[in-house]
């Protein structure tokens, strides 16, 4: 085998040359260029996906640098999507990077989702999660979602190509008052790195068509003890988002 940038992927029996070719044609949409979006986008770019669209309306703040490893001191005050684009282009100029420096309206979000093969929810806003979930569901796009607060993290995959897939609202039906942000609760820096890398792994498995994605399983970790738990779930027939007739 001729050595190339992606040779170590191609050596994996489950991936191989064909799997890497599929990865190189993959288009990924990432909402959020913060703690989760940083490692997720870095590994997707280094793995050679075709296109990454990264959305964030926030600017880089000094307190972000504790965990948002895609940004640096030189880009303080810069829009996070633009900062991420600069870093990703430096890592792999073969990848097309599109930055969206504002919060898209519903129509624009639908257009962004329609143009991707897999979407990553890397936000810290509950309302945004529900909207993103609903758009991905309607457009039948796989959604990899993760969240971290303090020392607790979780990740799962909703594969909306399956008409019987559960959705975010099935798993978390009540969301009033549940936003817990790093600015108030704190966050253990390495944990967002772990979960963001796992989001990239799930996206690559979906695009490359290998392995078993985390569909129907919520993986949870307590980083204080590094204890992992898994909870299986299924579609809720009473879900206001995805139940029949809705």
Regions found by a protein language model. Give the residues of each.
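Adenine nucleotide-associated cytosolic modules
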Residues: 1-246
């Amino acid at each position: 085998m001729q050595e190339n940038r992606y040779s170590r992927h191609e050596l994996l029996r489950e991936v191989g040359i064909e799997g890497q070719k599929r990865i190189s044609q993959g288009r990924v949409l990432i909402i959020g260029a913060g703690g989760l979006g940083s490692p997720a986008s870095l590994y997707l770019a280094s793995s050679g996906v075709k296109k990454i669209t990264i959305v964030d309306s926030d600017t880089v703040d000094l307190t972000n640098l504790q965990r948002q490893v895609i940004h640096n001191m030189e880009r303080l005050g810069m829009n996070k999507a633009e900062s991420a684009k600069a870093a990703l282009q430096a890592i792999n100029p073969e990848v097309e990077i599109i930055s969206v420096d504002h919060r898209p309206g519903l129509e624009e979000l639908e257009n962004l989702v329609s143009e991707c093969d897999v979407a990553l929810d890397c936000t810290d806003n509950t309302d945004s999660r529900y909207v993103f979930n609903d758009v991905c569901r309607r457009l039948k796009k796989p959604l990899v979602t993760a969240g971290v607060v303090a020392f607790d993290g979780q990740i799962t995959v909703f594969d909306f190509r399956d008409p019987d897939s559960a959705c975010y609202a099935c798993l978390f039906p009540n969301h009033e008052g549940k936003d817990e942000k790093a600015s108030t609760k704190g966050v253990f820096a390495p944990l967002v790195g772990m979960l963001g890398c796992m989001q990239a792994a799930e996206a690559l498995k979906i695009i490359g068509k290998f392995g078993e994605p985390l569909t129907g399983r919520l993986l949870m970790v307590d980083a204080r003890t590094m204890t992992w738990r898994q909870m299986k779930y299924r579609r809720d027939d009473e879900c206001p988002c995805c139940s029949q007739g809705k």
